């Protein structure tokens, strides 16, 4: 999939970069795999805002995606590639030989009419789902299960993949997209290949209105608020923060604070921690 740039006819097209969607073949989603989804708009059950800067956006229908790939031994044909408004990755519509239809994450390089299958005896081909014990070392996988039978939970975003590093006993070592190396049970399933639509990381919205279409509301800097609204607020003119470092609206450290519990039981499965991103790459926005 290629990216498309625009001439600066308007301020919104000057920096606009989008994907050309030439992989998407189906215009309308499969009716049997679509459900209505209530949009919470960042509110909890009491109507209180628990996640700021959420609301509005285009109305969506949720596509039911098969993350388990539990139809073992039943071949399926790729009928179409569909757009999904809830994620950057595209969806592949599968027609199984027993008549059932399912959506899966579309792997990179998949083609219309290609035959896919899941199970421990499946061939080593892109799009097939196998247990980690049956996948060769060095292979790239996505939609990796963390617990057997629960469905894929890791490496699901567009262009992402995990790498099978080693096998020892009942566990397989995976290098995740975050560079973390983690042990996963060998009976957990994963799909061969990487998730498609990897060019989405090179896109640019170009204007604030396109962000509103996605359901993202404006984000106001804390330094321009009053001191009753944010710890960064107050002062005369453009005053500094007045603290040793930036904090959240609730007074907690905003950058560099570790949020993982020290004594979490699953820490023993993490062989190497992820590489910490710098403040420059994270973007130290005054929230």
From Swiss-Prot:
Report if keyword Repeat is assigned. Answer: no
GO MF terms, alphabetically ordered: rRNA binding; structural constituent of ribosome; transferase activity
Disulfide pairs?
none
Q: Which residue windows does the record flag with biased composition (Basic residues)?
A: 258-287
According to its UniProt entry, the protein's GO biological process terms are: translation
The record ties this protein, via SMART domains, to: Ribosomal_L2 (SM01383), Ribosomal_L2_C (SM01382)
Keywords, in A-Z order? Ribonucleoprotein, Ribosomal protein, RNA-binding, rRNA-binding
Region feature Disordered, mapped onto this chain: 221-287
HAMAP family membership? Ribosomal_uL2_B
Question: PANTHER family, per this entry?
Answer: LARGE RIBOSOMAL SUBUNIT PROTEIN UL2M, RIBOSOMAL PROTEIN L2
Q: Which NCBIfam families match?
A: rplB_bact (TIGR01171)
Q: What does this chain do? A: One of the primary rRNA binding proteins. Required for association of the 30S and 50S subunits to form the 70S ribosome, for tRNA binding and peptide bond formation. It has been suggested to have peptidyltransferase activity; this is somewhat controversial. Makes several contacts with the 16S rRNA in the 70S ribosome.
The family line of this record is: Belongs to the universal ribosomal protein uL2 family.
Subunit architecture: Part of the 50S ribosomal subunit. Forms a bridge to the 30S subunit in the 70S ribosome.
Protein name per its UniProtKB record: Large ribosomal subunit protein uL2
Species of origin: Prochlorococcus marinus (strain MIT 9303)
């Amino acid at each position: 999939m290629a990216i498309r740039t625009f001439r600066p006819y308007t301020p919104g097209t000057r920096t606009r970069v989008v994907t050309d969607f030439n992989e998407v073949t189906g215009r309308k989603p499969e009716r049997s795999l679509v459900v209505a989804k209530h949009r919470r708009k960042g509110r909890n059950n009491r109507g209180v805002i628990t996640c700021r800067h959420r609301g509005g956006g285009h109305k969506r229908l949720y596509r039911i995606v098969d993350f388990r790939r539990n139809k073992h031994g039943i071949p399926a044909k790729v009928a179409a590639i569909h757009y999904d408004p809830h994620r950057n990755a595209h969806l592949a519509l599968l027609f199984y030989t027993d008549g059932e239809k399912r959506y899966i994450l579309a792997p990179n390089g998949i083609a219309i009419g290609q035959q896919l299958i899941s199970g421990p005896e499946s061939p080593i081909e892109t799009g097939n789902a196998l247990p980690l014990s049956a996948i060769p070392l060095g292979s790239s996988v996505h939609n990796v299960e963390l617990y057997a039978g629960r469905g894929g939970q890791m490496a699901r975003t567009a262009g992402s993949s995990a790498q099978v590093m080693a096998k020892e006993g009942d566990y397989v070592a995976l290098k995740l997209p975050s560079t973390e190396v983690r042990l996963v049970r060998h009976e957990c399933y994963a799909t061969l290949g990487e998730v498609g639509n990897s060019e989405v990381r090179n896109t640019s919205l170009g204007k604030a209105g396109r962000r509103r279409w996605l359901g993202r509301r404006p984000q106001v800097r804390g330094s321009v608020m009053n001191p009753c609204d944010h710890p960064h607020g107050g002062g005369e003119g453009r005053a500094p923060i007045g603290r040793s470092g930036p904090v959240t609206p609730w007074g907690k450290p905003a950058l560099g604070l570790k949020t993982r519990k020290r004594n979490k039981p699953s820490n023993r499965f993490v062989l190497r921690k992820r590489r910490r991103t710098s403040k420059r790459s994270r973007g130290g926005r005054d929230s």
